[in-house]
Amino acid sequence: MSDMEDDFMCDDEEDYDLEYSEDSNSEPNVDLENQYYNSKALKEDDPKAALSSFQKVLELEGEKGEWGFKALKQMIKINFKLTNFPEMMNRYKQLLTYIRSAVTRNYSEKSINSILDYISTSKQMDLLQEFYETTLEALKDAKNDRLWFKTNTKLGKLYLEREEFGKLQKILRQLHQSCQTDDGEDDLKKGTQLLEIYALEIQMYTAQKNNKKLKALYEQSLHIKSAIPHPLIMGVIRECGGKMHLREGEFEKAHTDFFEAFKNYDESGSPRRTTCLKYLVLANMLMKSGINPFDSQEAKPYKNDPEILAMTNLVSAYQNNDITEFEKILKTNHSNIMDDPFIREHIEELLRNIRTQVLIKLIKPYTRIHIPFISKELNIDVADVESLLVQCILDNTINGRIDQVNQLLELDHQKRGGARYTALDKWTNQLNSLNQAIVSKLA
């Protein structure tokens, strides 16, 4: 039996709970018990026979009780494995009729949570939506706030994945209302739940690139101190914060957030840690840091991870201003790097940075240099070279002018030198003034 199947609802543990429950006033029904365990023994080798056998448990029990509830859970699981989804839904709806009186509140909550977690592995979005909506409908009269919150959160995540933001906002409003005081303020006693809501809302604004709302919500989430959040939730919040800061050009803040997100994902065992490590590397390059991000104790074990290796090599080429190697790595590992839309969004900026560094080094010995020659050295079109030169001249990285008729860049080294001497002269005058002030005080 696979781990996933074992985890489905901790069958053995629950069997024990049922047999020896102190709350139960009835003696165990031996026929029911035998029928249940005989059915369970069939499910691996003959699942269809097991379904028929579990049906007999329901018939033997007559009135709704714990053994019928357990039999229905097994039938849901078997039908899921057989991809018999309509029958699975029918059995799930039948099981939900047991939660009001046939089994205890805690037991039903634990079981439904486990079922929802297991079904969440499905890629069939419509099936998941039906599951969550059916659960919420059944919970209207059950008054189980915890299960209602968890189910709504799962439905919200589904809408987020499907980019159905209108439906997601409706869910978020309901979730927020459940965590408010009578005055309509956030109930800080529900800090952990609030952080879950913020994480979901922050992901929505990140997907929509709504930085204004994202920034306010992100700051709000970091000020909740009453919660002991799950590291996965904090990983989501810090990752979205990193994306927000990077889009605003605040590379150092982005670097800090991505590093915190990576550590939280790593702690929770989430596969998002490798994605976030890629973002950390991206921020490291954009902030033009000479420090290798893989020198940190937390990141070092992932340096040679196949998922990360391309980014590791990219850092090396970037720090060495090796544009040929940089572009070669991008081409060779195109899917690994460029399939991520967030990385793709910022690769052009990295290319511009590395081309600028190579350009500065290339033109340094010259007073005049042909633009087609620069084009050849940088391996980009003449039009792209001109665009890069214009940007460098405007931000004073290069002192010069473009002669478009003759396709020349004319450099003014004297202007650059003059600016340096002006700064030195100003500094000397300030030192003289300081010296005179000290002498006057000592006199």
Swiss-Prot record:
A Pfam family assignment: PCI
Signal peptide: none
An annotated GO cellular component: cytoplasm
Any one biological process term the GO annotation gives: negative regulation of transcription by RNA polymerase II
Residue span, PCI domain: 254-416
Function as written in the Swiss-Prot or TrEMBL entry: Essential component of the COP9 signalosome complex (CSN), a complex involved in various cellular and developmental processes. The CSN complex is an essential regulator of the ubiquitin (Ubl) conjugation pathway by mediating the deneddylation of the cullin subunits of E3 ligase complexes, leading to modify the Ubl ligase activity.
Protein name: COP9 signalosome complex subunit 2
Lineage: Eukaryota, Metazoa, Chordata, Craniata, Vertebrata
Gene designation: cops2
